[in-house]
A protein has these predicted regions:
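Soluble extramembrane regions of membrane proteins in the secretory/endomembrane system
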Residues: 1-264
Length: 265
């Protein structure tokens, strides 16, 4: 089971709000992996994974140390093929750990591009170089003369911001991408995920024959700004990005959502 607890202040166990833990998972994944948020009671499972029997809460790093991840995947597959009523307490507990770890991993991949280091900065840079980058990409495809550095920089940002298969996973419900991008003021469309918003911004802008310019949704930029600010422990920048996001919601007729977006850093 996953809990909201982790060791803090010299090892003393405390409970933090779920939203704080979720923000950490989204913006500081390396730190989140060290938090003992998984509860394991079965001593045989703990022995099998080389965990301290005197503890009950473990981090992702604890659970996946060495070749534990491969062993969990292999054992979970074996247990999955076994009728539920025939599973031993050990098998039920280990399967629960494996399933919880899978959910954790899907959550960790659902808030931002995994290769991103400075999400807000990368979006800004991408907007700035898009015209030159698209020209270089088209020239590269046809073998025309172009600056290869422009092409490499543009391609690198594409690879950073759009992960292969992420859009299909988002549409199919495999990923947990939160729907944080509202439709326009005059639209009855559904809210979209950040991944879907970026994908459509890029494909729409790239469809032009020339004079390429990309318009990234202001809500997407505000969302990226919040994650980057939280990662860097910049409360003023976080609150500024949050204010921008709330302003966008207000201007686009999303007053009902404003009450869900008031959590300042």
């Amino acid at each position: 089971k996953s809990t909201g607890r982790y060791a803090r202040n010299g090892g003393e166990e405390e409970t933090i709000p779920a939203i704080e833990w979720l923000l950490e998972l989204a913006a500081k994944p390396e730190t989140a992996r060290t938090r003992p948020v998984f509860r394991i009671d079965n001593e045989e499972v703990k022995d099998n994974l080389g965990l301290d029997n005197s503890e009950k809460h473990f981090s992702v790093n604890d659970i996946t140390t060495g070749n534990n991840f491969e062993r969990l995947a292999r054992e979970s597959g074996r247990i999955h093929s076994k009728e539920t009523s025939l599973r031993t307490p050990y098998e039920k507990s280990l399967k629960s750990v494996a399933d919880s770890l899978l959910i954790y991993q899907r959550l960790a991949k659902s808030f931002r591009p995994q290769r991103s280091v400075d999400f807000a900065g990368e979006l800004k840079q991408f907007e700035e170089i898009f015209p030159i980058g698209m020209a270089a990409a088209r020239a590269h495809e046809t073998g025309a003369e172009h600056d290869e550095e422009d092409h490499d920089q543009f391609s690198g940002l594409i690879d950073t911001l759009i992960e292969p298969g992420a859009h299909e996973g988002d549409r199919g419900g495999v990923m947990f991408w939160p729907r944080v991008i509202p439709p326009g003021n005059d639209s009855d469309a559904d809210w979209r995920s950040l991944n879907s918003s970026l994908f459509h911004s890029i494909t729409n802008a790239a469809a032009a024959d020339r004079d390429w310019k990309i318009e990234i949704d202001p809500a997407a930029k505000a969302y990226a700004g919040m994650l980057t600010a939280y990662k860097n422990d910049k409360p003023e920048e976080f609150n500024s990005a949050l204010a921008g996001y709330r302003d966008y919601l207000d201007k686009n007729g999303q007053n009902a959502a404003l009450g869900k977006t008031g959590k300042e850093f």
